[in-house]
Amino acid sequence: AAAALAKANDLPLPHLVPVGLHFRRRELFRTDQYIEFGEPIPLTDDMVPDDMVAAVKAGEWVEPPAEIVHRIRDELQTRLPPMTPEAATWAEHRAVHLTAHAEARAEGRSLATWQEEVLAARKVRDAWPGRIASFPPEPITGSRFDRANEAAELLEQRGLDGRDLGPRGRVFRKANLSHLPSAIASVALFLTLLPFSITSLGLQITLGRLLGDSTDEGLDARTSFQFLAAFFGSLLIWPVVAALWTAGVWFTHDRLASLFGWGSNWLEMGVGSTLVGLTVVYLLCFPVFWASGKSFAAAWDVWVDSKKAWTRSRFPKAEKARLERLLDELVS
């Protein structure tokens, strides 16, 4: 339709842009993401028949010829697979990513970002011995894959992955104690703002959970409902919660004045009107709700990092020794 409109108005024809959406674990909170844009696919005049242009000019619509649709589909099918995990199973996907980490580790490097990991894993996948690109992808086999798969599953069983590996000579990386002050500050701020977080974000999370549980259309649909609750919940829920907080301030303003040593008329804010003070309180609720959400995310990151650091330190010795041998064999 866009191409027909452009041709009808003597404008340049649009291009189709393949997009790769890469999520580490799409269903998890605070997961890593990398959005990749491929080379645009130009649309030519011969792909937009004159009858389509005439129909669009008349405010109507006709379907494009099947051969043009198939031509564009085939072009997309050629370009899109390399921008996906292109793995037969998730276990294979994990094995390839771990191999990318192992190779970087052997070279004295680390894959610091999800984008670096995705691109490095793609190089490993494309260069895998005996692999033939196909659609759908054929499973990777061989002794090297067996070692990579076993190593990846050892980590996966305990919630770890290639990011937890240490430099060559040490299986796991150590916790970065330089982050301890900021971690403590993040948790302290989260606890301070916890009442606001529970009353605002807590209701949004509950709404997302209820909407997600109400669908039987699979994990993607569940995540979509949760996204809608997160996106629109602040528009629907926060104004009501802010009004309740403002009412609470009004009913307890004498107690608050005594607690903080303020004057009894502190809500008038020097203008002689309590309504002004209540309006300011109401408006201040929104940035506080936002800050409570940011503090929750920061505290969540601290929890996840601390949990993984504990898991690394308590990793069974036998499995750790086996993992080290597998990693050495992967890059030997």
Q: Where do the PLM segments sit?
A:
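Membrane-interfacial terminal anchoring regions of lipid-handling membrane enzymes
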Residues: 7-332
